[in-house]
Amino acid sequence: MKITKITTYRLPPRWMFLKIETDEGVVGWGEPVIEGRARTVEAAVHELGDYLIGQDPSRINDLWQVMYRAGFYRGGPILMSAIAGIDQALWDIKGKVLNAPVWQLMGGLVRDKIKAYSWVGGDRPADVIDGIKTLREIGFDTFKLNGCEELGLIDNSRAVDAAVNTVAQIREAFGNQIEFGLDFHGRVSAPMAKVLIKELEPYRPLFIEEPVLAEQAEYYPKLAAQTHIPLAAGERMFSRFDFKRVLEAGGISILQPDLSHAGGITECYKIAGMAEAYDVTLAPHCPLGPIALAACLHIDFVSYNAVLQEQSMGIHYNKGAELLDFVKNKEDFSMVGGFFKPLTKPGLGVEIDEAKVIEFSKNAPDWRNPLWRHEDNSVAEW
């Protein structure tokens, strides 16, 4: 079997799918994207495709190493996202050829279900509370919320009080009927993170995500030493070498590699094993589409330390398409009591509606995150 063609499709709301075709008619799907940089990743996919055309798709490990090492310059969000989507598609092909789901090829299940959580957008307490109520009606009891709006490097007590007030009202509204993590989104400087984490402790969040940016990872153990709240990070780390530094430094309790950013299934399985050796749990980052989610689920079901799975159903970014709009076998992604079951169809287990993908890829919008500025007109972290 040989790879004959790679096609990419930029899609709403902010996704990109790729299709790898073979000379035997077996097709694999992947989801390579950096949100807001889809065209750049698309170019990288097709550059890497030069290494793949005519090659045997079953040699996943070798092809991964070729894509990673052969170009001399390596790593980073663009190249690792391109590799990630290609890697997903190669695993999809292998599973289809062998008539087995990817988790079966990786040694079989370590669990029968995995807890899912849902993003709730909005910064106003009333909007967040309404969003939680809506999602609870369809079975969710675990959520992730914005931990704050933009903060200055040293900000005032009013900004801190505003962030804490939102969380306080949510805990008051729902008590211990729900659990929620708080995403600082890298918006907070290390000095302000110390202040904000201390103020949020009484409301017992499940975790705090990206308390500071990954490039400030030396602060993770310092922040962890002052709080009992688990700290989480990983969406802006792109290989096991990025995660190695964080694991060695300590401070992070939950790793969040993104299966569409951090080298795909092949790399993230290694990252999961590294985390387990440090007694660190796994909660793959996934505010993306169905192929990315499917890839995450296969890792969840073979990784002992996986504890939570993010998914994008109803997420505030989904303008123009919802999580399962391009999926034929929607029922396989159904949740029971807030848990996903293993996908059982061969490969990744997601059947893509290709005709719909082609139609929606025509004139797909180029999503960009907003540009925020502080009161003094300097650029703020989004």
Curated annotation (Swiss-Prot):
Name of the featured protein: D-galactonate dehydratase
Organism: Escherichia coli (strain K12)
UniProt-listed InterPro entries: DgoD-like (IPR034593), Enolase-like_C_sf (IPR036849), Enolase-like_N (IPR029017), Enolase_C-like (IPR029065), Galactonate_deHydtase (IPR023592), Mandel_Rmase/mucon_lact_enz_CS (IPR018110), Mandelate_racemase_C (IPR013342), Mandelate_racemase_N_dom (IPR013341)
Residues in coiled coil: none
Site note Transition state stabilizer, residues: E310
Entry's cofactor comment: Binds 1 Mg(2+) ion per subunit.
Stated induction or repression of this protein's expression: Part of the dgoRKADT operon, which encodes proteins for the metabolism of D-galactonate. Negatively regulated by DgoR. Induced by galactonate, but not by glycerol, gluconate or galactose. Repressed by glucose.
Transmembrane stretches, start-end: none
Cofactor annotation: Mg(2+)
Keyword Iron-sulfur attached: no
Gene: dgoD
GO annotation, biological process: amino acid catabolic process; D-galactonate catabolic process
Organismal lineage: Bacteria, Pseudomonadati, Pseudomonadota, Gammaproteobacteria, Enterobacterales
Function: Catalyzes the dehydration of D-galactonate to 2-keto-3-deoxy-D-galactonate.
Record note on what altering H285N does: Loss of activity
MF terms in GO: galactonate dehydratase activity; hydro-lyase activity; magnesium ion binding
Binding positions for Mg(2+) per the UniProt entry: D183, E209, E235
